[in-house]
């Protein structure tokens, strides 16, 4: 959540930053402006009544000490106290309304994030490994998966509906091996392996920014205050929800393998074949909680950690700086890693490493103590990596003319 003090002091500066996202936010910002104005008005009235109460109380005390008649002052104090209680309640309600309006406003755009309207304006930073020159026309992953009997798309539809898959046989062994390899690499780079619940309550999803704005994107358990996690970012970050961390314990680096569940609202017609876009998928996530001065360096570290896995699997990829119009809700700055898919003849996102600055920390009340003062941490998250998409990239990049798949040396020991 954006700093309320900043909004109260300089609303226009905040609005200018948010408009860099190129979203139609005028209505939301106007409603927030009105809520802030109402809160300020109520607060000023309350402070006026409190000042009056203090003044009359002082007069009452003086007259009492002088044994003078205080009946009028007593009545005035009683009447004012009733007004104070009513106005205090109104101020509390106005504050809640302001915070509700504020909770659906995305993070401020980082100064390092380039301006742009959409993914078309994202900027390539660098390429790593050169795509292979094929002597035959490369197939897409779903053709290879079916040919090798690794992925059963029809059974996924039968068991659930579209955008679900069944992985079996040697394909399942590769899938499992990829998870183990990713966790081992992440652990080697200093990230603690953690297994968390796949269900969380509403407060946790608020903390990382999925709720209340993106309720349609997550699966809710009927008649329960529980949701299936869209990413382990939610559980790992919220392990420290409402926590004060000693500065000596920063940074905190965590990794987790979890199933992830997304409704993919608004994705109708996109990537309808194969494993690129699924309602349920596995992901190995990185989350870091850092001192504000260290978050930029941590973002680079997380990117290199994810890239290291792709290099070990001999998968060409590139770093892409997201522009302001393509940022996620909680992100202030994001760099994607896109992997080359020869079957599609294009790069596709396989990791997204975001620095949310203190946006999530403010929502989730994650603080650190330094010099006897509590301050907000910075939180970062990123995939390392999306398992299904990594398997897709492995199949397409390492396919042979006969449809068989070459196994990279780094993966052999896990099979």
From Swiss-Prot:
Similarity comment text for this entry: Belongs to the class-II aminoacyl-tRNA synthetase family. Type-1 seryl-tRNA synthetase subfamily.
Enzyme class: ligase
Keyword Manganese: no
Organism: Helicobacter pylori (strain J99 / ATCC 700824) (Campylobacter pylori J99)
Superkingdom classification of source: Bacteria
Primary subcellular site in the record, as a coarse category: cytoplasm
GO cellular component: cytoplasm
Protein name (Swiss-Prot/TrEMBL): Serine--tRNA ligase
Binding site for L-serine: 231-233, 285, 383
Domain observations: Consists of two distinct domains, a catalytic core and a N-terminal extension that is involved in tRNA binding.
Annotated gene: serS
Pfam families: Seryl_tRNA_N, tRNA-synt_2b
Quaternary context: Homodimer. The tRNA molecule binds across the dimer.
Residues engaged in binding ATP: 262-264, 349-352
Job of this protein: Catalyzes the attachment of serine to tRNA(Ser). Is also able to aminoacylate tRNA(Sec) with serine, to form the misacylated tRNA L-seryl-tRNA(Sec), which will be further converted into selenocysteinyl-tRNA(Sec).
Subcellular localization(s) per the UniProt record: Cytoplasm
